[in-house]
C-alpha cells in the first residue's frame, strides 16, 4: 500500500463521480452563489461536490441525474421509517388540515408525550424541542440549575449536537460551558476524575454508544461507573439517546439496565420531522413547570402539530417496540456477516456498532474509543463511499451504516456483495490483518 496509489485511486473515483453527475454539479455550483459551500448542514458535504437528492420512496433515493440508490444512511438515523411512509404522510396531512400554527396547547402533544414516557421508563416527564442539539442544551441547563454547580463532564469523541462536539480537534462552535473532557470507555479514569472534581460537577453527559465517532459501544462497566460516580458526588447523569434509543425496544440504556437522571431524544421519534425531547426525573423536570418552576423554556415550533402527529403515527403504527427489536436483530446479523467477510478476506477492516447502526473501520483489534481510530487513513473511507455509490448504494463518507424499516433482504445482500467487491477491487490498498 502506497500513499500515491491511494491518491490515484481516489482521483479516479472523483473523476468517475464527476462524469456521472453533471446535474448535481450544476446544482451545487448554482447554490454556492447564495449559500457558503452550497450548504446548510456540514455533514452532507463531500468532495468534489455532494449529490443533489431529488426524491425518495421507501428505502430508495433518486439523485438529480436520475440514478437510483438503496438508502443505507437513512438521514443519519432520523429516517428509520424510510421515505414517504403512507402512515406518516396521512397523519401529517390530517394535522395540517386542522391548522398549522395554533399558538397554544394542542390536541396532539399530550398523547405523544405519554407514549414516549411509557416507551422509555426512565422518563417520568419530558419537554419537546426542535432538535437533539436543543434537547441536550436544555438538559445541561436543567442540571446546572438543579445542582447549583458549573462543571460538565463529557467524553472525547462525543457528539451531542452542532454546538456540542468533542472530537479530536476542539470545535470553535462548541458552546463555552465549563467542560471536563475525559476518555471514553475508561472507567478507572472516569471514577478518579469525577471524585477529584466532585464538588464542582453538575452533570455527566454521555452517549451509551458514540455515534459520530464511529458507532463505538459504551462498555457496561464504564457506563455503570458513571452512574455510581455521579450519584456519589451528587451530580446528574444524562444519557444522550438521540441515536441509541432506536437500538432496543425501550432504548439502549433500558436494555443495559442503567437508569439515568435525564435522557435526551431526537431524530426518528418525530416521524421524520424536526424533533427533540429531554426528560427524566420529575423533580428535575419540575424546574420547567410554569406554575412553580424557575426555568423558562420556549420555542415556537416545540409542539408543532406536524411533528406531534408524525411522531405518534410512527411510534404506534410502524416503529413499535417489536419492530425496534426486529430491526436491531437484522442489524446484528448484517454486522456479523460483514465482519466474517472481512476476516475471511484477511483485511484489517471491521464494522463496529449495535443493532441497526454500524460503522466501517480500517483497523484491527478492539475499538473502545476514538483514539483507537486515530491512525486510520481517511482516504480509504472515501474510496469505500464512492465504490458504494457505483454499486447504487447511498451511504456516508465516514463509513456510517444505518438500517431503516423498508430495506429488503435483497438490499442487505446487495450491501454485503458491494463490500466484497470493494475488498476484491481495492485489496492491494487495504491494510492486511495480522
Curated annotation (Swiss-Prot):
Activity regulation statement: Is inhibited by 2-aminooxyacetate (AOA), a mimic of beta-alanine and a known inhibitor of aminotransferases.
Species in which this protein is naturally found: Variovorax paradoxus
Keyword Amino-acid biosynthesis attributed: no
Protein name: Beta-phenylalanine transaminase
Catalysis performed (reactions): (S)-3-amino-3-phenylpropanoate + 2-oxoglutarate = 3-oxo-3-phenylpropanoate + L-glutamate; (S)-3-amino-3-phenylpropanoate + pyruvate = 3-oxo-3-phenylpropanoate + L-alanine
Binding positions for pyridoxal 5'-phosphate per the UniProt entry: 132-133, 300
Activity under varying temperature: Optimum temperature is 55 degrees Celsius. Displays a 2-fold higher activity at 55 degrees Celsius than at 30 degrees Celsius.
Modified-residue entries (N6-(pyridoxal phosphate)lysine), positions: 267
Superkingdom classification of source: Bacteria
UniProt function note: Aminotransferase that acts exclusively on beta-amino acids and exhibits a broad substrate range in vitro, accepting meta-, para- and, to a lesser extent, ortho-substituted beta-phenylalanine derivatives as amino donors, and 2-oxoglutarate or pyruvate as amino acceptors. Is highly enantioselective toward (S)-beta-phenylalanine (is not active with (R)-beta-phenylalanine) and derivatives with different substituents on the phenyl ring, allowing the kinetic resolution of various racemic beta-amino acids to yield (R)-beta-amino acids with >95% enantiomeric excess (ee).
Amino acid at each position: 500500500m502506497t500513499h500515491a496509489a491511494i491518491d490515484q485511486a481516489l482521483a479516479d473515483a472523483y473523476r468517475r463521480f464527476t462524469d456521472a453527475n453533471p446535474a448535481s454539479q450544476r446544482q451545487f455550483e448554482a447554490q454556492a452563489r447564495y449559500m457558503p459551500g452550497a450548504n446548510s448542514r456540514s455533514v452532507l458535504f463531500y468532495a468534489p461536490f455532494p449529490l443533489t437528492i431529488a426524491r425518495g420512496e421507501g428505502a430508495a433515493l433518486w439523485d438529480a441525474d436520475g440514478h437510483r440508490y438503496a438508502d443505507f444512511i437513512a438521514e443519519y438515523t432520523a429516517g428509520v421509517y424510510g421515505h414517504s411512509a403512507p402512515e406518516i404522510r396521512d397523519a401529517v396531512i390530517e394535522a395540517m388540515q386542522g391548522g398549522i400554527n395554533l399558538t397554544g396547547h394542542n390536541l396532539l402533544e399530550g398523547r405523544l408525550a405519554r407514549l414516549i414516557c411509557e416507551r422509555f421508563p426512565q422518563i417520568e416527564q419530558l419537554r419537546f424541542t426542535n432538535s437533539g442539539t436543543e434537547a441536550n442544551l436544555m438538559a445541561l441547563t436543567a442540571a446546572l440549575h438543579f445542582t447549583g454547580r458549573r462543571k460538565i463532564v463529557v467524553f472525547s469523541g462525543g457528539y451531542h449536537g452542532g454546538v456540542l462536539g468533542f472530537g479530536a480537534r476542539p470545535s470553535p462552535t462548541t458552546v463555552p460551558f465549563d467542560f471536563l473532557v475525559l476518555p471514553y470507555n475508561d472507567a478507572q479514569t472516569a471514577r478518579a476524575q469525577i471524585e477529584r472534581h466532585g464538588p464542582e460537577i453538575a452533570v455527566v453527559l454521555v452517549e451509551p454508544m458514540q455515534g459520530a465517532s464511529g458507532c463505538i459501544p459504551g462498555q457496561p462497566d464504564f457506563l455503570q461507573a458513571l452512574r455510581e460516580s455521579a450519584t456519589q458526588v451528587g451530580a446528574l447523569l444524562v444519557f444522550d439517546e438521540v441515536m441509541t434509543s432506536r437500538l432496543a425496544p425501550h432504548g439502549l440504556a433500558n436494555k443495559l439496565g442503567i437508569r439515568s437522571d435525564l435522557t435526551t431524544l431526537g431524530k426518528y421519534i418525530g416521524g421524520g420531522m424536526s424533533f427533540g425531547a429531554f426528560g427524566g426525573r420529575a423533580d428535575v423536570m419540575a424546574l420547567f413547570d410554569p406554575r412553580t418552576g424557575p426555568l423558562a423554556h420556549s420555542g415556537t415550533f416545540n409542539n408543532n402539530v406536524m411533528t406531534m402527529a408524525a411522531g405518534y403515527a410512527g411510534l404506534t403504527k410502524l416503529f413499535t417496540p417489536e419492530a425496534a427489536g426486529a430491526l436491531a436483530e437484522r442489524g446484528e446479523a448484517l454486522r456479523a456477516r460483514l465482519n466474517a467477510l472481512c476476516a475471511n478476506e484477511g483485511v484489517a477492516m471491521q464494522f463496529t456498532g449495535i443493532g441497526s447502526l454500524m460503522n466501517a473501520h480500517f483497523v484491527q483489534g478492539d475499538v473502545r474509543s476514538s483514539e483507537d481510530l486515530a491512525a486510520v487513513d481517511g482516504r480509504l473511507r472515501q474510496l469505500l463511499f464512492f465504490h458504494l455509490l457505483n454499486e447504487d448504494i447511498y451511504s456516508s463518507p465516514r463509513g456510517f451504516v444505518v438500517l431503516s424499516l423498508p430495506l429488503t433482504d435483497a438490499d442487505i445482500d446487495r450491501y454485503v456483495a458491494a463490500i466484497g467487491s470493494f475488498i476484491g477491487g481495492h485489496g492491494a490498498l487495504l491494510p492486511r490483518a495480522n
